[in-house]
Amino acid sequence: MRALDSAPTAHLYVCGITPYDATHLGHAFTYLTYDLAQRVLRDSGHKVLYVQNVTDVDDPLLERADRDGLDWRDLAAREIALFREDMTALRMLAPDSYVGVVEAIPMIVDMVAELVDRGAAYHVDDDLYFSVAAAPAFGEISHLSRAEMLAICAERGGDPGRGGKKDPLDPLLWRARRPGEPSWPSPFGPGRPGWHIECSAIARHHLGGVVDLQGGGTDLSFPHHECSAAHAEVAAGARPFARSYVHTAMVSLDGHKMSKSRGNLEFVSRLRRAGTDLAALRLALLDHRHTADWEWSASLLTDAVARVGRWRAAVALPAGPDAQGVLAAVRERLADDLDAPGALAAVDAWVDAALADAGGGPVGGSVGVGSSGGSLRGSGGAASAGGEAPALVARLVDTLLGVDLEPVRPRGS
């Protein structure tokens, strides 16, 4: 985050979902990280331009649609709508642009053509591949050995064993039309794009030259981000594609990373249907560093429900301790590589002091919460102490952490 301090506008690009199933907590944790990044940047005075793609044509989507007897476009539309509902429910700040691969086909074709013109692409049968030899910096993002790259490439959608390639690591740029698959016309023949070139083209078209922050899960570091950067840099004849990368750690359930293939998933939509306090769910996710893998359990949500209850009780008090200290502490922790658990601990300290001063019991009433995702600059002075302190802390929690401290009203009330 500190690398962006001098830029008036921060350009964020985050790799989005492949919409063939509902949003699980691993997805939610990933997008929460970049929601938090947006909030910190806006609070520090930056404008933010945020683009997120949607991989709305890809093998897993086509396979699921075929399995379920659905048109792949209908399946994608349904799951995209559910994903956006889940993100809104979790109070994620929406990207300025959601861009589907299907709508981006013309710009993707243009970038593939540029790579062909630069001699960085070649045919294997009717498919078109990118030559990693054209990208001298290939490998600098993931810092993996060649042996590691080959193993991971095979696990994550690559085809290192395909004959005819110049290098086993060369990624697919354009897949020639296959029977029963969607395809689009291009100068290289009808087909559809490879995975990595999609993000290269979308990011360039919507964000211009260099992306300030490129995001996604740790499983996207290689091959996806490595290859996307290589495509963009060779096409532009300049580097870097992105000034910084933030890769979000994996969330596990039952001892394994949450994954659609394994089926060990906790869905946001299921928790919503069960009437889960979504402020508590957001707190449960925020209580983990984005840099370390962690395990989800129901007890985390139970603890978060109790925690948000204490926070709501504290901000409903008629007065409280000075809020300037907690405001400074939350900003300091978030500026340190988005240390959300540290920021929550700072709020806990203020809440404990407020409840102790009030005798430990909650007081009725509610606090008006400020507009989420803005800036707290200018808050302070006499307004940060006494009767104004609870409202300022509520606004802090809303604006910087995205947690709504309005009392939860029972269904049907």
UniProtKB/Swiss-Prot annotation:
GO BP annotation list: cysteinyl-tRNA aminoacylation; mycothiol biosynthetic process
Keyword Transcription tagged: no
One Pfam family of this chain: tRNA-synt_1e
Ranges spanned by the short sequence motif 'HIGH' region, renumbered to the chain: 17-27
Motif ('KMSKS' region): 257-261
Keywords, in A-Z order: ATP-binding, Ligase, Metal-binding, Nucleotide-binding, Zinc
Top EC class for this record: ligase
Coiled coil residues, start to end: none
InterPro entries cross-referenced by the UniProt entry: Cys-tRNA/MSH_ligase (IPR024909), Mycothiol_ligase_MshC (IPR017812), Rossmann-like_a/b/a_fold (IPR014729), tRNA-synt_1_cat_dom (IPR032678)
Assembly information from the UniProt record: Monomer.
Protein name as it appears in the record: L-cysteine:1D-myo-inositol 2-amino-2-deoxy-alpha-D-glucopyranoside ligase
Organism encoding this protein: Frankia alni (strain DSM 45986 / CECT 9034 / ACN14a)
Gene behind the chain: mshC
